[in-house]
Amino acid sequence: TFLFSNSLTHVTSQLKTAERHLPALHMYEDTWGSGTCIGDSLNEFVKQYSHAYLTRNTVVLIMSDGLDTSEAGQMKEALQEIKKKTSLLLWLNPLLGTPGYQPERTRIKEALPFIDIFAEAHRLDSYVQVSREINKQR
């Protein structure tokens, strides 16, 4: 499990022992809300971790508003690699439930061709709908 904001952070061990380590995740909180380097973080993941974590059976879930502050093309490059190596790429975006939001007007548009399921994530029933979509695709 990885978190990213301005950089990528591997948090699998903290989540496995959540009772002891979950409070440690708060140390990353100061980078939240200060812009998201999605492309840079995903490229870092591809270079450092994809060989160990990505297979044709892997489902990748990204939860982000897609408001990327990386250079144009970075997110597309990384998602293209991730998509080649995995079975399903999901992107849950809390902005999709916002009236007037148009993903094609943001940098997320370069990611759309590589995403199998692009869904809203602003209400509990959004997650129920996503689970149905996953079952259809698997």
Protein language model annotation of sequence segments:
Residues T1-L3, V60-I62, W91:
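Structural beta-sheet core signal
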Residues T1-S13:
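Acidic, glycine-rich loop-and-beta core segments that form the ion-binding/anion-interacting portion
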Residues F2, L15-K16, G73-Q80, R138:
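C-terminal structured domains
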Residues T9, H21-T58, G100-Q102:
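Von Willebrand factor
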Residues S13-W32, T106-F118:
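Acidic, Ser/Thr-rich peripheral helices and adjacent loops at domain boundaries
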Residues N57-S70, D116:
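DG-centered beta-turn motif at the end of beta-strands
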Residues S70-G73, Q129-V130:
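Extracytoplasmic/secreted cell-surface and envelope-processing proteins
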Residues L79-R138:
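Von Willebrand factor type A / integrin I
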